[in-house]
Amino acid sequence: MSMTPREIVHELNRHIIGQDDAKRAVAIALRNRWRRMQLPEELRVEVTPKNILMIGPTGVGKTEIARRLAKLANAPFIKVEATKFTEVGYVGRDVESIIRDLADAALKLLREQEMTKVSHRAEDAAEERILDALLPPARMGFNEDAAPASDSNTRQLFRKRLREGQLDDKEIEIEVAEVSGVDISAPPGMEEMTSQLQNLFANMGKGKKKSRKLKVKEALKLVRDEEAGRLVNEEELKAKALEAVEQHGIVFIDEIDKVAKRGNSGGVDVSREGVQRDLLPLIEGCTVNTKLGMVKTDHILFIASGAFHLSKPSDLVPELQGRLPIRVELKALTPGDFERILSEPHASLTEQYRELLKTEGLGIEFQPDGIKRLAEIAWQVNEKTENIGARRLHTLLERLLEEVSFSAGDLAGAQNGEVIKIDADYVNSHLGELAQNEDLSRYIL
C-alpha cells in the first residue's frame, strides 16, 4: 500500500461526498502504516497507530469511509457494533471475539488471494480430472502403438469441446473430497469452543473421497476449487494471515456512543462501562488467542464512531478517550451535499436505478432540476422528522420510482424506446404532498 494521503483522499472522493476532515485523518493513518513498515525493526515495534474517533450524525459517511479505506488498503477489516458486547462474565459476546473475527477475515482474504495466484495450475489439473472422468481408460489391444495416438487425439478433441462449453450439461461420475463441515450452534460467548470443535470435525474427515454424479460445469468448478485448495500451503497461509492481522488489521467499532455513560445516571451498566473497560486492553495492546495462534493487538488500527446525540465523547471513560487520540467531527449533510450524492459518486443512486430499469428495456433520465428538488425534499424531511442522513435518499427514490418499477415491463413496450424524464414536476407530483404533510412524511418517508 504505497498510495499517498492525497491519492487516498482522491479515491475516497469517488464514493463519498464531503467530510474532508475525516478523509484526511484516515488517509494519514493509513499512510503511517506504510511509513512504519519502512522503519528499522527496533524502531518499528515502538511506533503504534493513532486510533481515531469519528463523531457525527447517522448517515453522513462514517461507516462508508472505513469500509472503502479497508478495500483500498486490501487489509483485514471488520466492522462491529459496540452494543453487541457485554462485560466479561456476563451472558453475551466478549470483546476478544472481535480479534477472533478479524483473524477469520484475514484468513479468508489471504486464501482468496493465494487461490487466485494458483488458479491457472488448478484449472489445468481440474481439466485433466474431468477428461479422465469423461474418457474411459485406454483398452489394451493387439495394436498397442496405435492406441495411445488415437486416445491422445480423442482427448484433445474432448479438451477443445470442454473449453468451448459444449460438454457443460453432460453428466459424469467423479470422485471429489467429502465436505465434512459440521454446523455447531452455541450460546454467545462460546465462539472459541465452537471454532475448535468445527476444526476437529473438519480434520477427522480430511482426505475422504466421495463419488458423485454431477454436470460437467458443476464438477469443473468443484474440482478447480479442490485443486486450488491442495496447491495452497495452509501453514504458510496461517503465518501470513497472522502477520496481516497484527500489522495491517483495521477494526471499526460503530455505536461507541451507546456504551457511554449518559449524563449523571447512577449505577454500573453491564452493557456500558464494563464494555468500555474491556475494550481498553484490546486497543492499548494485548494478546488474544485465535485459530491462527496468539495475536498481538498493539499495531491494529481501531476506528470508533458514534452519533453522540444523547451523550458526549467526554462521557466515555477517560482511559478510552486517551486511547482514541485523533478526533474527527463529521458534518450534517446540506441540500447541496444531497444533490452531489445523487449525481457525482461512482455508481451513484440515480445511476443504479437507471441501470436496473434498463435491464427491462425501460429508459429513465434524471434531469438536473429533478435531482435538485429530490435533494431539497430529502433535507426537508430530515429536518422535520428524524435526521437519518443520506439513507433518506433510498426511501425517497423507492417511493418516487415505485410505480415505474412495478410496471417497468408494460411501460417499456408503451414508451417505444422513449425515456421517462424525472424532472422537478415529476418529483413534486409523486413526493410533494407527502413531503409537505409532516404526519404523512413521518410514517411513509
UniProtKB/Swiss-Prot annotation:
Where in the cell does this protein reside? Cytoplasm
List ligand-binding residues for ATP. Answer: I17, G59, V60, G61, K62, T63, E64, D254, E319, R391
* Keywords on record: ATP-binding, Chaperone, Cytoplasm, Nucleotide-binding
Any one GO molecular function term: ATP hydrolysis activity
Please list the GO biological process terms of this entry. protein unfolding; proteolysis involved in protein catabolic process
Q: Which residues form a coiled coil?
A: none
Q: Which GO terms describe its cellular component?
A: HslUV protease complex
The organism sits in which domain of life?
Bacteria
Functional note? ATPase subunit of a proteasome-like degradation complex; this subunit has chaperone activity. The binding of ATP and its subsequent hydrolysis by HslU are essential for unfolding of protein substrates subsequently hydrolyzed by HslV. HslU recognizes the N-terminal part of its protein substrates and unfolds these before they are guided to HslV for hydrolysis.
Q: How does it assemble?
A: A double ring-shaped homohexamer of HslV is capped on each side by a ring-shaped HslU homohexamer. The assembly of the HslU/HslV complex is dependent on binding of ATP.
NCBIfam families in UniProt: hslU, PRK05201.1
Q: Which family is it part of? A: Belongs to the ClpX chaperone family. HslU subfamily.
Q: What is this protein called?
A: ATP-dependent protease ATPase subunit HslU
Annotated organism of origin: Pseudomonas fluorescens (strain SBW25)
